[in-house]
Amino acid sequence: MTTLTALSVASEIFPLIKTGGLADVTGALPAAVKAHGVAMRTLVPGYPAVLGGIEDPQQVHSFTEFFGGSARLLAARCDELELLVLDAPHLYVRPGNPYVGPDAKDWPDNALRFAALAQAGAWIGQGLLPGYAPDILHAHDWQTGLLPAYLRYSGRPAPKCVFTIHNLAYQGQFPSELLARIGLPERAFSLDGVEYYGGIGYLKAGLQLADRITTVSPSYALEIQGSEAGMGLEGLLRLRAGQLSGILNGVDTKVWDPSADQLIPATYDVETIGARARNKQALQARFGLRAESGALLFGVISRLSWQKGLDMLLEVLPGMLADGAQLALLGAGDAPLEAGFRDAALKYPGQVGAVIGYDEALAHQIQAGADALLVPSRFEPCGLTQLCALRYGAVPVVARVGGLADTVVDANEMAIATGVATGVQFSPVTADMLTAALTKTRALYADHATWRNLQINGMTTDVSWKNPAQHYAKLYRELVDA
């Protein structure tokens, strides 16, 4: 098998910088496709966390003037990841996270910051670095949406480009006056270019101009072609349906392995699943919950937002707790939801615990100790927490949308009888149906044999990158051979 070279371009990558599932995907993809003959490097911005976490950085190119300041490209490693780092302090060295400042507002120069990333990716793809000529480019989300535009309007030969939508809700829309500042010609500002409702649409540009589009589950690929999930881009996505496909994410099964996880109190596997009881006990103590081994303990690991359906959870919480259930929540996001769960923890001491923020170790501990994991999203491109939940024996209770629908087998009578059920699904996504799903979950939990089968079925489900990597490698080769 001939080795292909691929350059992935992304705004975050695990373990260096992470705000969500995008980082998990970009961090796991290189090793996954390597098994299928694809040598992948990843271009990422030089945030402080990235510069502080890389090994053996070597300058391979410098720019005297690059989007308002000097910059350089560093070749570096982090564990098994082969990286190119865009070290541009005027763009990336600042407090806050990659997209917002300490005041929780978008950085005012985000248009320039991520145009720079896309431009660097395009130049590398077109031979900027001697001796490195990637066969394929793979761009991720709105932050790299201009990459295929830079390729298209350069007038120079370029490799084919795959563009992946991780979440269509984040679109990167900016004023048209920035066109010259981001280095695009006037002809790019057209309906079949980067123009979007009178401005510049970074995500729209990627969808319009990439050679192939992927998103992170087959169901989501269909949903976004409709008005409810299409976010205004459904017409374009229907137009490009022949170039659009859904490839499920996987999880890094070395990072997420309950039999060897150093972040949890007690490791276990399918044969020793009873050891989860120790993790549940520790989790109850960590969240200030009553030490009741028989209480149905729900976990939530989520961004706190309308998309994630956590407002519905607050609405149904009193009824859920009346049945004796417990809730351990880890997340951050919209201020009203943060306040709502803080208040719930005060109102229901011993039954509700909330940690506002993100803590990787605590996320592992919730997966290992919760009886069930709640994911009541109104839409969910793929979702990773439910995949980790399957692997850890925390029964997922999910809305029947996107990747949640594709990865969790509902415990209906037939699925239970045939031994394939792995969780609970509900639809439509309303508070009433969430309540019904919680009631169903309680009934399943009370049937110890059925519940154990759900756990074992989940833990033996292949949630690794093996199958997704095959699909990506096949897609890359199709484009290169076309």
Curated annotation (Swiss-Prot):
Keyword NADP recorded: no
Binding site for ADP-alpha-D-glucose: 18
Reactions mediated catalytically: [(1->4)-alpha-D-glucosyl](n) + ADP-alpha-D-glucose = [(1->4)-alpha-D-glucosyl](n+1) + ADP + H(+)
EC number: 2.4.1.21
GO cellular component: cytosol
Entry-linked SUPFAM superfamilies: UDP-Glycosyltransferase/glycogen phosphorylase
Tagged with keyword DNA-binding: no
Keywords of this entry: Glycogen biosynthesis, Glycosyltransferase, Transferase
InterPro entries according to UniProt: Glyco_trans_1 (IPR001296), GS/SS (IPR011835), Starch_synth_cat_dom (IPR013534)
CDD domains: GT5_Glycogen_synthase_DULL1-like
Pathway of action: Glycan biosynthesis; glycogen biosynthesis
Gene Ontology MF: a single term: alpha-1,4-glucan glucosyltransferase (UDP-glucose donor) activity
UniProt-listed Pfam families: Glyco_transf_5, Glycos_transf_1
Annotated GO biological process: glycogen biosynthetic process
Function as written in the Swiss-Prot or TrEMBL entry: Synthesizes alpha-1,4-glucan chains using ADP-glucose.
Entry's family note: Belongs to the glycosyltransferase 1 family. Bacterial/plant glycogen synthase subfamily.
HAMAP family on file: Glycogen_synth
UniProt protein name: Glycogen synthase
Organism: Rhodopseudomonas palustris (strain BisB5)
Gene: glgA
